[in-house]
Amino acid sequence: MSETIVSEQTVSEFSPASADASQSVKASVGKINLLDLNRQQMRDLFMSMGEKPFRADQVMKWMYHYCCDDFNQMTDINKVFRTKLQEIAEIRAPEVVDEQRSSDGTIKWAILVGGQRVETVYIPEEERATLCVSSQVGCALECKFCSTAQQGFNRNLRVSEIIGQVWRAAKIIGAFKVTGQRPITNVVMMGMGEPLLNLTNVVPAMEIMLDDFGFGLSKRRVTLSTSGVVPALDKLGDMIDVALAISLHAPTDDIRNEIMPINKKYNIEMFLSAVRRYLEKSNANQGRVTVEYVMLDHINDGTEHAHQLAECLKDTPCKINLIPWNPFPGAPYGRSSNSRVDRFSKVLMEYGFTTIVRKTRGDDIDAACGQLAGEVVDRTKRTLKKKMAGEPIAVKAV
């Protein structure tokens, strides 16, 4: 076979271009990070090199089933092609720079992305192991009860930085083909950031999670959580089918406007209408959505709020997760008492809603829901504005 010349144009074509991600960890000069490509993109790349499309299947299997990042170890691929790959490509996941282990088995990793840190959380249980993955460096939505939101926002994560969190966790825990057991059975896009504000990178990353030559997860085991970016939610339904969870957290617009400013743009009825449209397109959700509801003491946790929530959700097939609020420094809220949570739950069940009180995991290492912070260079200048206004600033506990 004649030698294939790979031009700078080829490299550029298959290197995801994103202004938001331009400050990411620098790749080797001119090399394509294969973690940025889904299977079709990898096939297109390899065909441009004069190779057969099935080569992408082979390489992906090594990458994701064995967590292999060394082309020389891919022994069922001929040496000539391996040499080509070494010249133009690499497999480079973001590095873990800190690890904390909770007394309950939860692990939190700080992942370095372009000089900043995002956080990824591994939650093992008897029957499954869930990985909570970040989609952005910080978050722009300013939800008042969430630590991530208080850090401000810097940029979207690239595909390689999203799927790289899964790859890095799987490599640490033990790759499927190495141990014989799946290190990760579920992935939830519930880490730092709003996934629907980064569809360009989140969707290809989820495609790799679902791909049989990727991590091979069922679409019911990959969950995207959103605070309600309605146009993007409508778009998501045409792009991919995964389980959906919605961060509702309030039964009325008045309360939600106060704790989740996005509601001023997309109110509850607009949000739930978009959810119902998504459910009509989706098989992964089995006809119902998961509603997430953080319990804030004397803010949204009274029995009157439970009745309002039941009325609000009467036309939306769902199950409800009640989430004990997890504190962080500078936050103005308190956690609801067990008795208030119990009364709230009983009201919802009387209406016929499947209602679960989520067990808090990893709170002793600030890895629980709403506690992820990382290290963010805030492009929104949110923390500076708070400081100038004399408002409390949430800081990551050390």
Swiss-Prot record:
Enzyme class of the recorded protein, top EC level: transferase
Co-factor note (free text): Binds 1 [4Fe-4S] cluster. The cluster is coordinated with 3 cysteines and an exchangeable S-adenosyl-L-methionine.
Active site: E119 (proton acceptor), C369 (s-methylcysteine intermediate)
UniProt binding sites for S-adenosyl-L-methionine: G193, E194, S225, S247, L248, H249, N326
SUPFAM superfamilies (UniProt xref): Radical SAM enzymes
Subcellular location: Cytoplasm
GO cellular component assignments: cytoplasm
UniProt keyword annotation of Methyltransferase present: yes
Chain positions recorded as [4Fe-4S] cluster binding sites: C139, C143, C146
Coiled-coil portions: none
Pfam families associated with the record: Radical_SAM (PF04055), RlmN_N (PF21016)
Disulfide bond residue pairs: C132-C369
Enzyme Commission code(s) on record: 2.1.1.192
GO molecular function, one term: tRNA (adenine(37)-C2)-methyltransferase activity
Entry's Gene Ontology BP terms: rRNA base methylation; tRNA methylation
Entry-linked InterPro entries: Aldolase_TIM, Methyltransferase_A, RlmN_N, RNA_MTrfase_RlmN, rRNA_lsu_MTrfase_RlmN/Cfr, rSAM
PANTHER family: 23S RRNA METHYLTRANSFERASE, RADICAL SAM CORE DOMAIN-CONTAINING PROTEIN
Physiological role: Specifically methylates position 2 of adenine 2503 in 23S rRNA and position 2 of adenine 37 in tRNAs. m2A2503 modification seems to play a crucial role in the proofreading step occurring at the peptidyl transferase center and thus would serve to optimize ribosomal fidelity.
Note: Reaction proceeds by a ping-pong mechanism involving intermediate methylation of a conserved cysteine residue.
Family classification: Belongs to the radical SAM superfamily. RlmN family.
Protein name: Dual-specificity RNA methyltransferase RlmN
Name of the gene encoding the protein in the UniProt record: rlmN
